[in-house]
């Protein structure tokens, strides 16, 4: 990866030297890592079900987690079921649907549930509306909906208007813009809060947070990491709150491979906590 691919967005604002290709040694041994998936660990495809994380990258993630006491989680707009399918055979802590569902290091799940009537009626309205917008697709996530227009960008404005109408009707819902997608999710759920929740728990607590993301949905995560004195990394172009930038998914892969080769395998540690029960939270 060329030196310019890994840079600080503040380098032009002061006299600091552009960062090297790996994190500073004094930080790398005590970090908690958070990664978005689509557009960060995996190339974006025309349809969500075409996305694949290379096996070598999954192995890099597993090794990075092992090197850092398992303090590594995936933070995504996808459901946890999808994330598990994309990262098998490994099982990482997860935050899915922009933080509306979360699985901690123990396997305990924290889920925001919408009233069934909202899921049913909102889903029916969205399905009927998208039938009239050729090329758009509706992805149902239980407590959330994704309106994709990558194949029909001319319908972006119509989908935004539709999503705004849905969120006005049901104030428990909020609109989230993304890359060629408009999402409707439980109000108050975001990636920043998910990262903050992980940072209060073992093995993440007390570590320096590092978050890689590529989309508008990742900005709340960057803000939380910045406030904690961590390292926020924007993948790709565009304005951002992140303080570092990698140019592409492939540069993330190269960073993972380089970081793996520069660290020694530590002794295994057990960060699980006993005596937990799964629970869900309703709004």
Regions found by a protein language model. Name each.
Residues 52-141:
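Active-site phosphate-binding/coordination module
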Residues 136-153, 174-185:
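Charged, glycine-interspersed solvent-exposed loop segments at helix/strand-loop junctions
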Residues 97, 103-124, 176-206:
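Substrate-recognition "cap/lid" segment bordering the active-site pocket of phosphatases
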Residues 24-47, 74, 195:
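Asp-based phosphoryl-transfer active-site loop
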Residues 3-6, 11-16, 28, 54, ...:
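Mg2+-dependent phosphoryl-transfer enzymes with acidic/Ser/Thr/Gly-rich catalytic loops
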Residues 79-95, 155-174:
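Substrate-recognition/cap helix-loop segment adjacent to the acidic, metal-dependent catalytic center
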Residues 39, 94, 147, 195, ...:
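Residue-level signal for inorganic ion chemistry
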